[in-house]
């Protein structure tokens, strides 16, 4: 089909019964907004048995109950006023990905670190797999060295390889220290 250059084309997906469904990216963005609002019940966005697989320090959570108890609630308690600043999203079929940071004030215990009252940026990268309109899997990487540096703890004792950089990044939003 040929369209004039001024027309915008919107992607519409239909389920097997012909009803319009949400895209993978729409589901992920709505979930992110719900987490920012500190919604207690995440079942609208996640399968009960979804897998949350993350880097060292975050762990692996099997199922929604474990995710809410062992990641979402402690994170929400430590950083209650958070705002997600996702910089880029990608979508490929039933997978979506993003990177960005969460801006938050350190109000509660964070992995043994007493509240500092500091406003920090929490860098993250996420990959989600959506099945039947809900998130079935989330693979995430949280930049703990950047978080700890902002909270006054340098785990590299001044010997991190970022010390070898000749210039700061062009995009200031990528600088977290």
Predicted features, each with a name:
Residues 7, 11-177:
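C-terminal and inter-domain tail/linker signature
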């Amino acid at each position: 089909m040929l369209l004039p250059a001024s027309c915008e084309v919107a992607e519409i997906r239909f389920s097997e019964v012909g009803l319009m469904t949400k895209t993978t990216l729409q589901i992920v963005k709505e979930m992110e907004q719900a987490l920012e609002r500190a919604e207690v019940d995440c079942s609208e966005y996640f399968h009960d048995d979804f897998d949350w697989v993350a880097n060292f320090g975050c762990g692996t959570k099997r199922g929604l109950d474990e995710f809410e108890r062992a990641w979402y609630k402690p994170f929400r308690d430590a950083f209650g006023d958070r705002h997600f600043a996702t910089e880029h999203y990608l979508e490929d079929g039933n997978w979506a990905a993003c990177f960005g940071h969460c801006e938050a004030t350190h109000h509660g215990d964070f992995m043994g670190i007493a509240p500092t009252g500091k406003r920090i940026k929490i860098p993250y990268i996420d990959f989600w797999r959506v099945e039947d309109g809900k998130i079935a899997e989330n693979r995430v990487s949280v930049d703990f060295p950047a978080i700890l540096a902002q909270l006054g703890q340098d785990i590299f004792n001044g010997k991190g390889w970022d010390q070898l950089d000749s210039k700061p990044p062009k995009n200031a939003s990528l600088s977290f220290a």
